[in-house]
Amino acid sequence: MASTQCFLHHHALSTPARTPLVRSIVPSLKPNQLLVCRAQKQSAPQEDNVNSVSVSRRLALTVLIGAAAVGSKVSPADAAYGEAANVFGKPKTDTDFQTYNGDGFKLQIPSKWNPNKEVEYPGQVLRFEDNFDATSNVIVAITPTDKKSITDFGSPEQFLSQVDYLLGRQAYSGKTDSEGGFESDAVAIANVLETSSAEVGGKPYYYLSVLTRTADGNEGGKHQLITATVNDGKLYICKAQAGDKRWFKGAKKFVENTATSFSLA
């Protein structure tokens, strides 16, 4: 009676040996192991041995197919249960932002923001704004300076006092008393929420988070994030902002990522 037996070999062929019946049909193979199946003829039919040890030709073929599946490389499109399959086998990319490379600088801009030609500040070279809300925008301004480093302006708060035009100037100059914590005759206020400094590429940077409010309560105020540095006699400023209401409805992510992504190129 003919039967088929499978033997596991390493680099060199070894003497086949009978092994007891195992529960798993497909063996675990390492890259340097080879599964060999050969047919042998038994001298006499032994039903017990056939039932416990012998492997039928059909089962041997199943073993080979299973072993091939184990040894094959899993494609990127395969996914475990409960996971989404990447059918094209390509890594996912963040489509929420696009890279902008300017003259001496670079930053990440929200993909849904469009360029705008409006010039609001001295030295402004770039402006992008939200398609649906112009209050959410980013500008980049480059102006000459005699400072060698951003730290020559003093602390971040002292620097802000020298570029306070970024926060908008009060146009009203009459007598008034507004509620909401405004000083007498003032219709606008700016609160510095956070300041920090860091060194990127050997250059110091200032980061400031400012909340500006007006007496009319428009948008509940504006969150303005400023990134600034100095290089080769030029002051680089990036300011990204969003209205207070939209800030807490998802705009925070886009404004923060845009402002913190700014750096010299």
Curated annotation (Swiss-Prot):
Native organism: Nicotiana tabacum
Chloroplast listed as a keyword: yes
Subcellular location: Plastid, Chloroplast thylakoid membrane
InterPro entries: Mog1/PsbP_a/b/a-sand, PsbP_C
Gene field: PSBP2
Lineage: Eukaryota, Viridiplantae, Streptophyta, Embryophyta, Tracheophyta
SUPFAM superfamilies: Mog1p/PsbP-like
The protein's name in its UniProt record: Oxygen-evolving enhancer protein 2-2, chloroplastic
Induction data: By light.
Thylakoid recorded as keyword: yes
The organelle targeting sequence, given as a residue range: 1-79
